[in-house]
Amino acid sequence: MLTVKDTYNQIGVQFSASRGYIWPDLRPFLAAVAPSSTVLDVGCGNGRLLLGLPEQIEYTGLDFSTSLLKKAFENHPQVHFIEADITEPDAWTDLPQFEYIFCIAVIHHLANRREQLFLLKQIKKHLQPDGRYLLTAWNLWQPKILKHHLSPQSLNLKYKMKNLKYLAIPFQKHLRFHFAHTKPYLEGLLREAGFENFKIEKTSRNYLIHN
């Protein structure tokens, strides 16, 4: 199976076409963003969060997919996008602190605790003291996804027998790696990364992590 980066570079055009709207779970959080705020969108993809944000914000989007960022630049030519791997320190070195940080449907693509913790620590570091954040992880234990845990593709994943949270889910003909988080696992990650007073809401499709 391809790496997550290579997968998204292959499916970028088709995937972007399927991500042209704001999920209902996200709308209340985006509606709360004040005009003129500074916003960091971690794993921004094609920049779709901008569809639900005020126009008068200072927005920065990070993503490692050249294909998805091409669509982002096409859709939002005046916006600041950066091509970078968010699991690498260089992606964060020159970034300031932000009033709002969003990280939507990203952390479930990170394969190990080290990368997951690094991402969370960087989000905490780059959030202003009174800032607001929202991260989401797919709820990969929902009924329609359960079949993928024992699919031939998932069972062929390296280390599957060592970590039953690993699974492969197809997008069209391409497989994407996923890490199936649970609420207790996420709570442990957040505490280890230094977060306090956080909330984790479980919906039918997502875990919503916010303050």
Annotate each PLM feature.
Residues 1-40, 45-93, 114, 133-211:
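Class I (Rossmann-like) S-adenosyl-L-methionine-dependent methyltransferase catalytic domain
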Residues 102:
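A conserved beta-strand element that flanks and buttresses the S-adenosyl-L-methionine
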Residues 117-129:
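A short glycine-rich, Lys/Arg-flanked "PGG" loop and its adjoining helix->strand segment in the class I
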Residues 105-109:
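Short catalytic micro-motifs in class I SAM-dependent methyltransferases
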